Design a protein with these regions (language model features):
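Short, highly charged C-terminal tails/helix-capping segments
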Residues: 11-12, 60, 167-182
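Hydrophobic ligand-binding cavity/cleft-lining segments
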Residues: 1-62
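A short, structured loop/turn motif at beta-sheet edges
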Residues: 33-38, 86-94, 122-136
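Short, surface-exposed coil-to-beta transition loops
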Residues: 25-27, 78-83, 113-119
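Hydrophobic pocket/interface hotspot
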Residues: 39-43, 85, 96, 137-139, ...
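Glycine-rich portal/gate segments that line the openings of hydrophobic small-molecule binding cavities
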Residues: 48, 54-110, 167, 176
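Generic short beta-strand segments
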Residues: 6-10, 46, 97-103, 140-144
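Beta-strand/loop substructures that line and gate deep hydrophobic ligand-binding cavities in soluble
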Residues: 103-164, 180-182
Length: 182
């Protein structure tokens, strides 16, 4: 917490705008004709059907989302925590913080003393035509706060993992991953 009346207190680092001196380099999103509740169910309830195999310990592993953790169950029955759930607001936002040593954590460059996170943000859209998109899922580095002026996007070093996750999700729902350079 930052208290500006204490002049000796250091200014807080703004994680939303920069990450290790880097700026957000890409915006990744998926527009879908699914209703928002269906897009949310695909993201959360059916995560085991789309989660990238490259991020699992083995082909036989099963991924599951609990209230506090993203878990992987191996073919041997071992349960491996993949990420901590930072926030999960139904049909709105899911933020995960991968653990170091997991495949996702290694791909994101997570180290013990840092807390890297990714937020999946769902927006309901008003379609311009009957066939128009009804929902939009974006992925953003860091923890989404919902501020109007909040900068969204992915840091360059997290782009590979974000594209892998969003690409798998988009294929599962029959949509296309969209990328915009920032």
């Amino acid at each position: 917490m930052h208290y500006p009346m204490f002049s000796h207190a250091p200014e807080p680092a703004d994680q939303q705008h920069q990450h290790n001196g880097e700026e957000r380099t890409a915006a990744l999103c998926v527009e879908s004709t699914l209703e928002p509740h269906e897009a949310w169910a695909a993201l959360t309830e059916y995560i085991h059907l789309w989660w990238p195999r490259q991020l699992l310990q083995s082909e036989e592993s099963h991924i599951d989302l609990s209230t506090e953790l993203l878990l992987e169950e191996t073919a041997d029955g071992d349960i491996i925590p993949v990420a901590r759930i930072i926030q999960c607001e139904n049909e709105d936002v899911l933020t995960i913080a991968p653990y170091p040593g997991t495949r996702l954590g290694r791909l994101l460059g997570v180290v013990e003393e840092s807390e890297e996170s990714l937020s999946f943000i769902l927006d309901a859209l008003t379609p311009e035509t009957a066939e128009g998109p009804l929902s939009l899922l974006e992925i953003s580095s860091g923890t989404y706060t919902g501020r109007e002026d909040e900068e969204l996007g992915i840091y360059e070093e997290q782009e590979e993992a974000a594209a892998l996750l969003m690409g798998a999700y988009s294929r599962f729902i029959g949509a296309e991953l969209q990328k915009e350079e920032l």
